[in-house]
């Protein structure tokens, strides 16, 4: 049966689409996400059409007023499931409101191909800037924790074995550095997102005299894309964004994994706030780090969305294919998970309880000061490091609290000489065994010494201020573009009945 109200199918297709076909081809969550962006695109395109004399100003005014009403009513009012997608749902509601003679002109010189590509970029841009702001909050939380624990000793690990003494500040600053790089990667990604496909039409552009520079400017883009086929078919920006989010998720997962371990009885370094924990349905004593486990687990989900996007795009010929519809939800879910995970992690860090004494107590377990004892032997005796390494390795077989006599015995076994006769003293050995002395001696760039850590915190805070200024500039530029669009809309609708 023919559906004459379906403005898209009524011309070429005589039969109404089956319900199961409509359900199969629908992309409702992604369409709802794109709804605000589609209205922006419709407004900018309509303003440009009127400016270029392609449609009458009276028709443009009617269209813009109807779009304002649709925006006010919200996404639920357009009844997306009744149409192929949000784009046709909006256009159909528009035509129903103002008639086809006016409303039917809005799509002049435009295809859904360039329309949806533009909408995705606008929505992705908003999420990208939001994720950058979320990362700023997480970095701030990590720096605050580092500031509070500049002198909190703890064991550092390699292979998850006690390795050398460090501080909680030094450890948290490592994570802060990784999330700082994540911010830089996102800032860099904007240049690949912020270019406008609008005006590419189906793929070969259009015979209408469109002003693509104007629509790009009104929508906050840096410039129009200069190949119309690339404009409608390019999804490499999605591959790029999901890749960068996958890296963020890996960094989040590593931090979450540590915090889960540290909250166990075996480590006993931290306790999570009750807000970020759950209990057992059978074991009443349990306090489970479910939230952080989900942060860790969902990193795999985001990596999966990245791989799905790559796998879908890799086999597609230019230009547009409906397979691309399956890529957008991968981006949407990746943003949803990554943004929520970053926010959750920031909250967990802000409310964490650090068990300083337990960290300090375990900072020397596993003979973590062995490296400093070897270094002290080198500095005091002139022996090669590899020789000193062997001497201290002998001591490690016997435990981790050697006296000068113990070091002498091991050195006699190794080289036939006592290191005490070569310049090593009992005081030197005792200082080398002290975990705080170990930390303070590591004062070069990147080390855990107090002054070095304080300098790193200061450097990170300054960098965050610069990043905040960059983010503010990006948002301000976007807001100014939208204000320009609003002014154009008002100038065309004021005084029009």
Swiss-Prot record:
GO molecular function per UniProt: argininosuccinate lyase activity
InterPro entries noted in UniProt: Arg_succ_lyase_C, Argininosuccinate_lyase, Fumarase/histidase_N, Fumarate_lyase_fam, Fumarate_lyase_N, L-Aspartase-like
Enzyme class, broadest EC rank: lyase
Superkingdom of origin: Archaea
GO cellular component: cytosol
CDD domains documented for this protein: Argininosuccinate_lyase
Family: Belongs to the lyase 1 family. Argininosuccinate lyase subfamily.
NCBIfam families named among the record's database cross-references: argH
Name of the protein described by the UniProt record: Argininosuccinate lyase
Organism: Methanocella arvoryzae (strain DSM 22066 / NBRC 105507 / MRE50)
Name of the gene encoding the protein in the UniProt record: argH
């Amino acid at each position: 049966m023919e559906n004459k109200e379906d403005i898209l199918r009524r011309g070429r297709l005589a039969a109404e689409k089956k319900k199961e076909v409509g359900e199969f081809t629908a992309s409702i969550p992604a369409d709802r996400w794109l709804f605000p962006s589609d209205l922006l695109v419709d407004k900018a395109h309509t303003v440009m059409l009127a400016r270029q004399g392609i449609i009458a100003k009276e028709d443009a005014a009617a269209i813009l007023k109807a779009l304002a009403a649709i925006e006010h009513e919200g996404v639920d009012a357009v009844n997306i499931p009744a149409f192929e997608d949000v784009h046709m749902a909006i256009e159909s509601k528009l035509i129903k409101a103002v008639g086809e003679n006016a409303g039917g002109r809005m799509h002049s010189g435009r295809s859904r191909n360039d329309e949806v590509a533009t909408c995705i970029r606008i929505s992705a841009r908003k999420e990208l800037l939001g994720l950058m702001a979320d990362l700023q909050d997480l970095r701030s939380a990590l720096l605050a924790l580092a500031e509070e624990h500049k002198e909190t000793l703890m064991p550092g690990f390699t292979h998850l074995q006690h390795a050398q003494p460090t501080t909680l500040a030094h450890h948290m600053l490592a994570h802060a550095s990784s999330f700082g790089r994540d911010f830089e990667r996102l800032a860099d990604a904007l240049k690949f997102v912020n270019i406008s496909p609008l005006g590419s039409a189906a793929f070969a552009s259009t015979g209408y005299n469109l002003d693509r520079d104007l629509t790009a400017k009104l929508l906050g883009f840096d410039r129009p894309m200069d190949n119309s086929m690339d404009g409608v078919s390019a999804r490499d920006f999605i591959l790029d964004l999901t890749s960068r989010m996958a890296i963020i998720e890996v960094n989040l997962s590593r931090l979450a994994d540590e915090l889960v371990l540290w909250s166990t009885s075996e480590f006993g370094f931290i306790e999570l706030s009750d807000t970020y924990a759950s209990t057992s349905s059978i074991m009443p004593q349990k306090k489970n780090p479910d939230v952080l486990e989900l942060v860790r687990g969902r990193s795999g989900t985001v990596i999966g969305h990245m791989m799905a996007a790559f796998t879908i795009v890799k086999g597609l010929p230019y230009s547009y294919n409906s397979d691309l519809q399956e890529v957008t939800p991968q981006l949407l879910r990746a943003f949803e998970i990554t943004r929520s995970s970053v926010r959750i992690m920031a909250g967990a860090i802000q409310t964490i309880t650090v068990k300083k004494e337990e960290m300090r107590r375990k900072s020397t377990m596993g003979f973590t000061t062995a490296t400093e004892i070897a270094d002290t032997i080198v500095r005091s005796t002139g022996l090669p490091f590899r020789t000193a390494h062997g001497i201290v390795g002998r001591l490690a077989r016997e435990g981790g609290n050697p006296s000068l006599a113990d070091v002498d015995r091991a050195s006699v076994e190794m080289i036939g000489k006592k290191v005490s006769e070569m310049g090593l003293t009992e005081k030197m050995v005792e200082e080398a065994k002290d975990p705080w002395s170990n930390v303070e001696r590591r004062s070069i760039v990147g080390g855990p010494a107090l002054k070095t850590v304080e300098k790193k915190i200061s450097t990170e805070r300054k960098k965050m201020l610069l990043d905040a200024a960059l983010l503010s500039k990006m948002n301000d530029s976007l807001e100014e573009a939208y204000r320009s669009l609003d002014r154009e809309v008002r100038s065309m609708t004021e005084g029009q009945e």
